[in-house]
């Protein structure tokens, strides 16, 4: 058997199968076979290492889709631009600074790596694979932040702090963990980044969202500034959000598995990366179903990501039982995190980045010290629940505390400096109009579609709207001011009427059939959005009761002349009635004149469609 392997570090492997014998004609020794297998294994996993990096790069698309889908349409272009630029800007600063700090020679007692320009001065011996691999991980840390600070952050400010994260903040703490720094020397374990990437990104997201404040209309406050109500801002396209979730889950097999060194270890990592998010999603579905009355779609998408984040650090050291327990906790923790941000911390996080990445990054890191088992391939650790005592758990807690402290201190300083110089947040007008228009000159990310953004979509009951008096003379002054006393039709009767019907979309087909059976031969149909005073419990979005936001309705307009208008009204009422709020309304108008454009016929003659 002849084997030709390309130059060292190259990811090309060429085999020619034949018969290999030594000079004496004997079959090759076991030692030679073992050496060949090792060489082949090294090359195969070297190739997989780079394929995994490509998987992680593709996760940028997943983050972009999740963030765009979970926010409003007027900011979709801005979200896409941020997710593109944080990678591109991160690459620019990672070349001269970030890579050396992360994997350079230890300095300051393992606190930081020594920056190097080897990519320019010694390219032939440069560690190309590790550069690409660590670059895509670095970009993930920066992109996590954009979701929590979406819809109100200046694009320039985003570019600045993304550069700082990629150049300094992430490389230093990642050096502690993966670059041979002080945490690594102690035995801290974070295989793929629950702590180094997700907790850091989620913590930065929380700090940034808290410092710049909530989106306009997210919280209602009293005169003392106390939050009295939380408003739900549903994402404009849950389908795009779901696509992003699936892209991320797919990419996570590379995220977690790329650094595997043996086939069994890779298989075990894939298993854990499948079990934990699946369990987390099912647990979240059941919990939201019980808690809110219906399974929450967006929360379940977040739960899938939460399970993936939580399994990232321990994916190589846990068995199936550990992965299941980690997933169960992640599914509950993400719901708690979203509720906590909205109702306790009053931090506006549009996509749930804090709950998904920060809280579950912490949980996944701690889980190593609880569920690590030597039955996992290549694992040498034992967690608390597998007879390992508190040693590894203590190391994991130390890592969480120190990395979080580093992140809080550095990013608070960075955000404060940005806010005092170029400004962190856009103006009120820019936020209301949308960042697509104001920041990028993009009229709409969906060309040809009109975008409507209504912050407060409900009508409230007050002294002017509760008009229950039968006699106008007995009404209060406020009620009189809000009402119009009608004694006679404004327009003279012509015998021709316009009937406008607002109804539920679900009743349209029955309404059309009933009107057709009545003799109505033509109608104008428009899909509209409507709202009104809503009494009773409303729907929930991510655990927050929604104001009666504008709901889809159908508006049907018909012109009747020979058909008695009372008969039309009775037919419509009978067809639309269900006994529930929102059955619809009927408006009747006098029509002064009808003109058929083609023939010039008027009134009744113009209404005849049959020649």
Region spans (language model):
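Sequence-pattern detector for short linear motifs
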Residues: 10-12, 85, 510
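General helical secondary-structure elements
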Residues: 3-5, 26, 78, 421, ...
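Generic detector of low-complexity/intrinsically disordered segments
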Residues: 15-17, 22, 35, 469, ...
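Glycine- and aromatic-enriched membrane alpha-helices
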Residues: 29-487
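Compositionally biased, intrinsically disordered low-complexity segments
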Residues: 6-8, 17-20, 219, 487-489, ...
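Short, Lys/Arg-enriched N-terminal segments with co-localized hydrophobic residues
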Residues: 1-27
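Enrichment for repetitive, rod-forming helical segments
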Residues: 14-17, 67, 89, 205, ...
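Positively charged, small/polar-rich N-terminal and surface patches that mediate targeting and assembly
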Residues: 438-444, 457-611
